[in-house]
Structures are given as structure tokens and as C-alpha cells.
């Protein structure tokens, strides 16, 4: 279930429910496709929201830099969202787990352990 979303210039960062907490995933605004390489799972909702906001702010900042747009507000937003994420992450002890690593862990634990007796 989608809980919240934060939009950058080309991507939307969605916070969804996940069995292990809250998943932040990246969706292309033009095509609606998910980027399978970008996903992070957080144990706490506030940190997941802060991460989505920070990711969107960073994308807006990077796009403005590439387009040579001078806008102090974009830089201010990035700094504020980054400070908020770092503060919440530190206070709640939640730095997130890469979604690809979590999938690999789930696949490994789902396989039975082969025991060999000599």
C-alpha cells in the first residue's frame, strides 16, 4: 500500500508498506516504471518519509545543476531535508537496508540448508 510520495524532477519516490517495515522505491514520472535498482527498506516510517523527501530534493538539485539554473531555494531544500534525514536516522537507529540486499537475504534464507554427513 502506498503511504506517501515525494516528486523530484523525473522520478517519484514512493513510501510503501513492506513486511519488514517501509519500502522507498523510485518510479519514473513519464513511464510509470519502477527502477528495480533503487529501493531501500526502513524499519521506521519517519525515516522512510525523510529519505524519500531527501532523495527527491537531491534529484531536483542535480537537475538544476545540469541545467545551470540558479535557485538558492533548491539548495536550501536539499540541505534541510538532508539534515532532517540524518537527524531522524541517528535518533531512531534506522539507516535502512538496500532492497537488492534484502531480496538476496530472503532468497538465501528460503533455500533449505544442505547438510552433508561424512
Feature map (PLM): residue ranges:
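Short N-terminal "domain-start" leader segments
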Residues: 1-26, 54, 75-117
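Intrinsically disordered, low-complexity segments enriched in small/polar residues
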Residues: 11, 20, 40, 47-49, ...
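Alpha-helix boundary/capping motif
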Residues: 45, 71-72, 81
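A C-terminal-region feature
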Residues: 62, 69-71, 77-78
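A short, exposed loop/beta-hairpin motif centered on an aromatic-Gly-Thr core
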Residues: 29-50
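Short regulatory "switch" loops immediately downstream of catalytic or recognition motifs
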Residues: 26-28, 59
Amino acid at each position: 500500500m502506498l503511504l506517501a510520495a515525494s516528486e523530484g524532477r523525473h522520478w517519484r519516490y514512493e513510501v510503501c508498506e513492506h513486511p519488514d517495515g517501509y519500502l522507498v522505491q523510485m518510479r519514473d514520472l513519464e513511464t510509470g516504471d519502477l527502477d528495480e535498482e533503487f529501493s531501500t527498506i526502513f524499519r521506521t516510517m519517519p525515516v522512510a518519509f525523510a529519505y524519500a523527501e531527501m532523495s527527491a530534493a537531491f534529484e531536483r538539485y542535480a537537475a538544476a545543476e545540469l541545467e545551470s539554473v540558479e535557485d538558492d531555494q533548491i539548495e536550501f531544500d536539499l540541505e534541510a531535508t538532508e539534515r532532517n534525514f540524518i537527524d531522524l536516522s541517528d535518533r531512531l537507529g534506522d539507516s535502512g537496508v538496500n532492497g537488492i540486499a534484502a531480496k538476496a537475504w530472503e532468497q538465501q534464507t528460503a533455500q533449505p540448508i544442505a547438510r552433508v554427513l561424512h
